[in-house]
Structure formats: structure tokens, C-alpha cells
Amino acid sequence: MSKQLIYSGKAKDIYTTEDENLIISTYKDQATAFNGVKKEQIAGKGVLNNQISSFIFEKLNAAGVATHFVEKLSDTEQLNKKVKIIPLEVVLRNYTAGSFSKRFGVDEGIALETPIVEFYYKNDDLDDPFINDEHVKFLQIAGDQQIAYLKEETRRINELLKVWFAEIGLKLIDFKLEFGFDKDGKIILADEFSPDNCRLWDADGNHMDKDVFRRGLGELTDVYEIVWEKLQGLK
């Protein structure tokens, strides 16, 4: 399958395929935090992220969620549907943590009575600012119906993920999703789902996600390996 690099990101490289509607996503060993300010090469990270994300996307597909995932090609590669990415990071919070706690001056780990969905404008130059629905419309990123769909679909995905992670003894604190338009103009889930873009805490409150790297709490791959081993228990 011939391929040409079309995009190089912080965590993945994207390649063309012989089918104009398909791409190959190659997961890197690079770990970044604080919008790329903190950066490090960590051997084995790409393999673990690809394994975890492929597994989660397969389960989401089986549950009826429309995603870009087609199949896992190798340890670090997966085949995806080509999408036009919507320049929004859609964040859902089940508990207070991270920037939410800092922004509102509250402790981490407080359960939210109703999960909160937030939008962040995907723009590295602006440091991905927190925006609301009206900003999304002003920037002509999405209209009312599309905004409602993004929120509804994110909440539906959350209900699935919460159950799966609870089954393996992990609490889903929050996560970030990205969506895109497929060749037919339908909004589908894209990007990845791994400990890179979610927060997971075990029963003792230990971080099982990229906060280990952000906050210097231990070895990233050790934690990701534990998450991957636990997930395989869902099969």
C-alpha cells in the first residue's frame, strides 16, 4: 500500500493510501504536554496508544458509534477513513480536574452531578482557547444542529466508556474527542482514544494517564501498559 506523508502531528503522522477516502495513522513515541512545551521521546508509547485506541474504537464501532476507524494494520499503524477535521476539541468532564479545577478554583476529584461538555478552539497559535457555542457559530465552525449533535454524541460515548472503564476498576475523570466530516458530509468520531487524551484514576486515586508525564509522577509506559492489560479483560 503506497503512502505519502500529508500531516505530521505531535502524536501521529498521517499518510495517504491508494484509496483517496482512506488514510494511515502512524502513532509516534513522542509525548508532549502543555501544547508541546514539554516534549520527550518515550520508547513503546506509540505501540501502546495504537493498541488502546484501536481496541476502544472497535468497541465503539460495535456499539453503533460512527467512527473513522477501519482496522489496525500493525503495532503502530491503523487504517482510518479520511475526514475533514472540525477544529474543535470536545471535552467531557465527569469529575473536576486539570484546567477545570484551576479555572474555577475547586479541588480535583469532585463528581459532577451532570457531566459537563466544553469546546476548545483547535488553534496552536492561540493555545487552543476555551470557547462557547456562540463562539463556535461566530467562527463558522458549526451551526446549532451540529453543535447539538456533537454534545449529544459525546455524552452517548461517555456513557459507554464509563461502563467499560468501571468494569476494569478505573474511573473516567474526563476526556477529549475530535470529530470530522466523512466523504458523505456525516459527522463521525475521529482522532484517537487513549490515556493521552483522557484522565483515568484507579481506586486509590492514582493517575493512569498522561498526567503521569505532565506532572512527573512516574514512567508513562508502565502506566499505559497497565491500562492496556486491564482493557484486554473486557474481551
Curated annotation (Swiss-Prot):
Keywords: ATP-binding, Ligase, Nucleotide-binding, Purine biosynthesis. CDD domains: SAICAR_synt_PurC. Pathway: Purine metabolism; IMP biosynthesis via de novo pathway; 5-amino-1-(5-phospho-D-ribosyl)imidazole-4-carboxamide from 5-amino-1-(5-phospho-D-ribosyl)imidazole-4-carboxylate: step 1/2. It is an enzyme of class 6 (ligase). InterPro entries: SAICAR_synt/ADE2_N (IPR028923), SAICAR_synt_PurC (IPR033934), SAICAR_synth (IPR001636), SAICAR_synthetase (IPR050089), SAICAR_synthetase_CS (IPR018236). Transmembrane segments: none annotated. It holds the Pfam family SAICAR_synt. One of its GO terms (biological process) is cobalamin biosynthetic process. One of its GO terms (molecular function) is phosphoribosylaminoimidazolesuccinocarboxamide synthase activity. It catalyses: 5-amino-1-(5-phospho-D-ribosyl)imidazole-4-carboxylate + L-aspartate + ATP = (2S)-2-[5-amino-1-(5-phospho-beta-D-ribosyl)imidazole-4-carboxamido]succinate + ADP + phosphate + 2 H(+). PROSITE patterns: SAICAR_SYNTHETASE_1, SAICAR_SYNTHETASE_2. Its EC number is 6.3.2.6. Belongs to the SAICAR synthetase family. This is Phosphoribosylaminoimidazole-succinocarboxamide synthase.
